[in-house]
Regions:
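Polytopic transmembrane helical bundles with strong interfacial aromatic enrichment
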Residues: 1-176
Length: 176
């Protein structure tokens, strides 16, 4: 019975890990290649869209998905290596999963620390700018928001690159 429960837990967490990773990678691909270019082209209106996304919890959603992906991945690596056995970790498959996991961890950190925080700052600045009359102060706020949106766009692409590395290494891990 313990073996069956362990197998069911492993398979459930593996399925959850793949599902979470798919949602996370898809979200970042959408953000990098569709959403951010459109928002940058909209100028000040793009900031209002970011306010809406922030109020709906987009940054919290991405943080939750990335965190759960990393945590389930750590469990899967622990399971694969028999409790982080160094010999298994040094195997080709262990290295592929380990490097892929590290790339995923970097993606999660950059996603939250840079992309998420910058997106939240844009939303706060745009809310502030909406209450300021046209003039130099509003211009400075809009310029800051534009720079932060560019940071979100740039680092969303960086996150996606690390996710692709993780995705490829996870896909080939059992076959190397």
């Amino acid at each position: 019975m313990v073996s069956l429960m362990g197998t069911l837990l492993f398979l459930s967490l593996r399925g959850l890990h793949v599902l979470l990773a798919a949602v996370w990678v898809g979200s970042m691909a959408f953000t990098s290649y569709l959403l951010m270019p459109v928002l940058q082209g909209l100028g000040p209106v793009g900031g209002h869209v970011m306010i809406g996304l922030n109020s709906k919890g987009m940054t919290r959603f991405i943080a939750l998905i990335s965190g759960m992906t990393v945590l389930t991945g750590i469990y899967l690596f622990w399971h694969f290596t028999g409790g982080f056995d160094p010999e298994i970790s040094r195997s080709h498959a262990g290295r592929a999963f380990g490097i892929g996991g590290f790339a995923g961890l970097i993606a999660a950190i950059v996603s939250r620390a840079i992309v998420g925080r910058s997106a939240e700052k844009v939303a706060r600045i745009m809310e502030q700018a909406s209450m300021v009359p046209d003039g130099p102060q509003k211009g400075e706020l809009m310029q800051t928001a534009t720079l932060l949106r560019q940071r979100v766009a740039t680092f969303s692409t960086v996150v996606l690159a690390f996710q692709v590395i993780a995705l490829i290494l996870m896909a080939i891990g059992h076959y190397v």
